[in-house]
Amino acid sequence: MATKLQDGNTPCLAATPSEPRPTVLVFDSGVGGLSVYDEIRHLLPDLHYIYAFDNVAFPYGEKSEAFIVERVVAIVTAVQERYPLALAVVACNTASTVSLPALREKFDFPVVGVVPAIKPAARLTANGIVGLLATRGTVKRSYTHELIARFANECQIEMLGSAEMVELAEAKLHGEDVSLDALKRILRPWLRMKEPPDTVVLGCTHFPLLQEELLQVLPEGTRLVDSGAAIARRTAWLLEHEAPDAKSADANIAFCMAMTPGAEQLLPVLQRYGFETLEKLAVLG
């Protein structure tokens, strides 16, 4: 069922049909991927965007790798059957670390993943101490440790895995206040350090949504680093050099996996990000 947004008594009108534009899917388990989408849209405003979020299986951080791979492939397949894709962005660190090989094997369009911005953080740190703030799944996965060994072996890496911060970011987009006390409790291991990290990698796409609150809690001068801008640049290059000619003149659309009250409450948020319609996506499996 498609749901149009209302603003007071003014109906939300669909966008005027335009020239066909390359269709780009941005996918996440929740709404954290909107932070990545926002960076891509800033660089590439004239694309046809689809945002899909898996509110049935959210969050992915505690799910098995086999489940995540099967689920992500099924969702991208379902979107591709509705709209031929020029490119897909898996805007979820957890899903990216395990599902990219399967996606790239199945589809002929480029698939971009999101990985923790450890390499730029290692370049930016002044005291040699880098914090990685991510889900527990990302913190534990061997891929993350390989990135650290490759790009930050001369740094002291302090890792914190938190599922609660994902929930805080989702709640913020639903209009709820973010508890600074909750953030202080989550970050307590760093806040108690004699010399805490001066550079923090936001290793989950939900966490840039909490940037304002994090800067209030972390020591003054702490740098926050995420992958959004780099993903946008990579997307632009691939669309120019490798993407198939898959275009649509339709308005931007968002897909959820179940039309729950929580999903419906996100309609005003999605409209602010430029998505005219929210629909339930039928996924096999």
From Swiss-Prot:
Signal peptide: none annotated. Pfam families: Asp_Glu_race (PF01177). Pathway: Cell wall biogenesis; peptidoglycan biosynthesis. GO terms for molecular function: glutamate racemase activity. It catalyses: L-glutamate = D-glutamate. The active site is at C92 (proton donor/acceptor), C204 (proton donor/acceptor). GO terms for biological process: cell wall organization; peptidoglycan biosynthetic process; regulation of cell shape. Gene3D superfamilies: 3.40.50.1860. Its EC number is 5.1.1.3. UDP-N-acetyl-alpha-D-muramoyl-L-alanine binds at R104, G113, V114, V115, P116, A117, I118, K119. Substrate binds at D28, S29, Y60, G61, N93, T94, T205, H206. It comes from the Bacteria. Keywords: Cell shape, Cell wall biogenesis/degradation, Isomerase, Peptidoglycan synthesis. PROSITE patterns: ASP_GLU_RACEMASE_1, ASP_GLU_RACEMASE_2. Provides the (R)-glutamate required for cell wall biosynthesis. Monomer. This is Glutamate racemase. It comes from Escherichia coli (strain K12). The gene is murI.
